[in-house]
């Protein structure tokens, strides 16, 4: 890719030199036909550059932003040269990227690969590992496993001596949300009782409260939480029949750096009004 840019620069310089040489010869008048020929050739060169450089630029951008296979190879090479915490950081970053591109099988293999490393690491890495598993289970629509992982997260939040990435109040708040979310996934949405509706209202309230926090946590996880709770608000409003609010929050899941598959389901729902797509 770099060679292609260097070649384009060389072509541009050659075309410019040819154009100037042709103009000088034409002005002198001694070899006028040769001068015209050089000018025409240089103009053709300029036209070729004008058509090829934008394509090259777009191809480079596409490679930088969308080549998940190249990104994967690069991250694995870096991880191979690292150990301990640095290796885990690189692999966790890779798993996020793979999940964002729906490479779920490879994400699962890497999660299994880092499991022994996580067991020997600090509680913060155990939490990150659980959140990655939660995201993977959500993408696979395995809500039973989501509930199991949420229970483990609650236990970690309540027993961990580390503050992980959260302030103390936010820490407790998140644990409470996860408890209600676990209950939410077990509801029978076709036959909601009064107590079921209380769970939905409480989860809706807690998620809105969490999103109103002004202090900033670690950027990556803060964005993940914002995405997750926008989604929870969307589907709780959906169960309450407030489609307008549901659409607002579900659309917000598309305005984050990480792909959330529920956004596609949200778009489908608002086209078909089929609630079963969510549950």
Residue ranges: model-predicted function:
Residues 42-49, 76-86, 112-123, 151-165, ...:
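Solenoid-like repeat scaffolds
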Residues 94-190:
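Intracellular, membrane-proximal regulatory regions of polytopic membrane proteins
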Residues 22-37:
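Membrane-interfacial hairpin junctions
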Residues 30-33, 59-76, 98-113, 140-159, ...:
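Helix-turn-helix repeat elements of alpha-solenoid scaffolds
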Residues 36-66:
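Transmembrane alpha-helices and immediately adjacent membrane-cytoplasm interface residues
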Residues 1-14:
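Juxtamembrane interface helix immediately N-terminal to a transmembrane segment
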Residues 58, 89-96, 125-135, 171-185, ...:
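"A position-specific structural signal for the A-helix of alpha-solenoid helical repeats
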Residues 194-279:
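Long, non-transmembrane cytosolic or organellar matrix-exposed soluble domains/tails
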